[in-house]
Design a protein with these regions (language model features):
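Pre-Walker A adenine-sensing motif
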Residues: 14-22
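Conserved helix/coil segment N-terminal to the catalytic DExD/H
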Residues: 92-107
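Walker B catalytic acidic pair
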Residues: 114-115
């Protein structure tokens, strides 16, 4: 565990007090603090204030990912006995299952959506459920360090789901039609349009909405973050016939294909250059051993480390290599009995590894910037004394270069966006 709540109460930063006060004043609002900047305790501060006003009877629902609830809420928060007594924790996947009707039948005073970027897709089941839950809740709080994926529409979808600033009254189609510029694409079923940016004439309104109902907190020079060393290890790769065919598939998809079609084509080439491919029946066909495996010993021999992978086929290779030196369970890794923590790139939310290791190796990298950013902040956090080392293993002159470039580009846009919001 990092900072306890009692310690936090004596060390609150001004932005944390301001965040708590904004939540209480606006009632439906979001904290968009960078990972590690401390957004959970301001939310708990607000919950405790609301609970006191309701004579200890506030009904609170906290929705988060399974990883966050298992690795953070139940480990670091619940044992401190600081949540209102009528607090219920539920995973996003459980919430959209059989208990959804039970949740909707309950009158909640407060809905908290942790890692609220989980509702940025307006067509997802969790977005629709959160929208219904927050519609009648007196308070609805969202928090995430990665609110923006590809565009501001991602942020708006979160505001809509939580009914922040009156955005719940809009449908997605009506809002985008009024406020957004569109990009035209062509797919198998003809022409389609995708909202990309806020129309220039509406930017002042949009910025005012965010300023009033959302608090963005970026890293600053006073944080004393440890140095972050990113090492791109380019591994020689002899292109095989299978890779050439897979790469050709990307080109043949065409400029106007849907995003899904493009991602499928890229994913096939990515798999093949790592020695395997998933066939339509989900059977893995292997072409050759992944040459990246030989590069991992250097980092494991130096110190304990996290190895991030994308597909189960990668996990199987890593398990064969490291055997009982590795685990995929965070709590087991924290005991110190294992040299290696194997994490699938989607399982990277909310837990703290800064006292366990300071090296993260991306064995196979997902193109998602949000997953990348969430992962590096498991180790690179406030209060850490040791430099953090990020290693990206990349087969040279393959699609992996483009995947890393896409992540870097989104990182630059995110950094610029957060710095602009902080200074306004």
């Amino acid at each position: 565990m990092g900072l306890t709540y009692n310690e936090y109460c004596t060390k609150r930063r001004q932005y944390q007090e301001m965040g708590r006060d904004m939540l209480l004043q606006k009632k439906h609002a979001c904290l968009f603090y960078e990972p590690g900047k401390g957004k959970t305790y301001p939310v708990i501060d607000a919950l405790r204030t609301i609970d006191a006003e309701k004579n200890g009877n506030a009904k609170v629902l906290i929705i988060s990912s399974a990883d966050a609830i298992k690795q953070m809420w139940k480990v670091d928060i619940v044992p401190q006995n600081i949540l209102p007594k009528n607090t219920y924790l539920v995973t996003d996947r459980t919430a959209i299952g059989d208990i959804s009707e039970t949740l909707l039948a309950q009158k909640w005073d407060v809905i908290v959506v942790d890692e609220c970027h989980i509702v940025k897709a307006n067509t997802s089941k969790i977005h629709k459920l959160v929208y219904k839950l927050c519609r009648y809740a007196e308070y609805a709080f969202g928090m995430t360090g990665t609110p923006r994926g590809n565009s501001d529409v991602d942020i708006w979808c979160q505001l809509q789901a939580l009914h922040v600033g009156g955005q719940g009254k809009f449908s997605w189609s009506a809002w985008t039609r009024i406020y957004c510029d569109f990009e035209t694409g062509y797919g198998a079923y003809g022409k389609f349009q995708t909202p990309t940016t806020i129309k220039e004439k509406w930017l002042p309104w949009w910025n005012n909405l965010l300023d009033e109902y959302c608090m963005f907190v970026d890293y600053d020079e006073d944080d004393e973050m440890p140095p972050l060393d990113i090492d791109i290890v380019k591994i020689p790769y002899k292109k095989t016939k299978e890779y050439e065919n897979a790469y050709k598939g990307i080109i043949e998809v065409g400029e106007y294909a849907t995003t899904t079609e493009k991602m499928v084509a890229i994913s096939k080439a990515h798999q093949v250059c790592n020695g395997y491919i998933y066939l339509p029946d989900k059977v893995v066909h292997r072409f050759h051993d992944n040459s990246k495996l030989a590069y991992l010993d250097k980092y494991v021999d130096q110190d304990r480390c996290v190895i991030v992978y994308k597909h189960i086929a990668d996990y199987e290779d890593l398990c064969r290599k490291f055997g009982n030196k590795a685990t995929n369970k965070v709590d087991e890794f924290k005991t110190g009995r294992y040299r290696v923590l194997l994490l699938q790139c989607g399982n990277c939310k909310s837990f703290n590894l800064q006292d366990c290791c300071n090296t993260i190796v991306f064995y196979t990298l997902d193109y998602s910037f949000i997953k990348y950013k969430q992962m590096i902040h498991r180790c690179w956090r406030l209060g850490q004394k040791r430099p953090t080392k990020i290693v990206v293993l990349e087969h040279n002159d393959t699609v992996e270069q483009q995947i890393w470039l896409a992540v870097q580009t989104k990182q630059s846009i995110h950094n610029m966006y957060m710095s602009i919001k902080r200074t306004n």
